[in-house]
Regions:
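Conserved N-terminal catalytic/coupling substructures associated with nucleotide/phosphate chemistry
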Residues: 1-121
Length: 121
């Protein structure tokens, strides 16, 4: 499982590459859909299911996965998004129930906030 420190180190690589190239079976980067909170939550639930089916992993919310340059790729997650509500949404919309662990990660780019969602096997 990736730690916040691991993610911070990986984000440095965005200066010379794209997040999609950093992804693997247990790591995914997703842009937060700022236009539709419902769509963003639906995507989050889908990612939780994918990670659970794949044996667990970490999803980094707030990073465009096909954009080069750290400042361009890190868009962030709006500060009003409540991680407790995200956790409840994933739990309520999955069967069997998935209980993700969320963590805020401060960054200087975008909204200044990324969210890490960890799914344990």
């Amino acid at each position: 499982m990736r730690t916040a420190k691991d993610i911070i180190e990986l984000l440095l690589e965005l200066e010379h590459g794209i997040a999609d190239d950093l992804e693997d079976q247990d790591l995914d980067f997703k842009q937060w859909d700022a236009q539709s909170r419902d769509k963003a939550v639906k995507t989050l639930v889908q990612m939780a299911v994918c990670m659970a089916n794949g044996g667990g992993g970490t999803v980094v919310l707030g990073v465009a996965d096909r954009v080069q340059g750290r400042a361009n790729a890190i868009l962030g997650v709006p500060p009003e998004i409540d991680i407790n509500l995200l956790k409840k949404a994933v739990y309520d919309q999955t069967d069997p129930k998935i209980t993700p662990v969320f963590e805020d990660l401060s960054v200087p780019e975008g909204t200044g906030r990324l969210i890490l969602m960890r799914i344990y096997p």
